[in-house]
Amino acid sequence: MGRPPDGVLARARYSPAVGGTAPTARTRTDVEVRALINDDVEALTEFFASVPEGDRTFFKEDVSDPTVIAGWVAVADRHRLIALVDDHVAGYVAVLKGIGWSSHVGELRLVIAPEFRGRGIGRLLAQRAVVEALELGVVKLVVDVVAGQDRLFEMFTKLGFEQEGRLRRHVRNANGETHDLLVLSHFVDELAASLSVESPAP
């Protein structure tokens, strides 16, 4: 089995329980995180085109199709966010709600442009997802990481995720190579409870 590139893609599941907005955030390194707007279709299409074809193997949606991205914008999905550096799309994260017996969970998809990897943008977007989950009353976040993506694995574990399982040969790339899939989880309701206990009375 070949080794997948670090920082390519992570998938997580979460479930929003209450409504909420996704405010713009800016870091000291001038990375802006915000929800998608109509003007982002072209830039986001170019962003996904910049991701190596081999990396896109792990995507669940046809991100090479501008109509797919236009569809995201058309429904005003505030759970699809981008990271901007000097007005260039550096990263993308999506938080998607599950259905049926998984309606209490959801899915997070994270992609960082090759030239911006290793700069902490992935961590910033992952942290944003956890914060949004707390705001939405999510009970549990589950992250899927392809085995061998050590930097991604380390990033999520530092954010409080723990490995729950390993699915053997669960992912196959365009070359037919199979990879194990690691399942990590984070009980964000417990985090919210601890923050509530630690917060001083007004």
Write out the residue ranges for each language-model feature.
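A short beta-loop-alpha structural element at the N-terminal edge
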Residues: 31-44, 187
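Conserved acetyl-CoA-binding loop-helix of GNAT-fold acetyltransferases
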Residues: 118-131, 135, 154-158
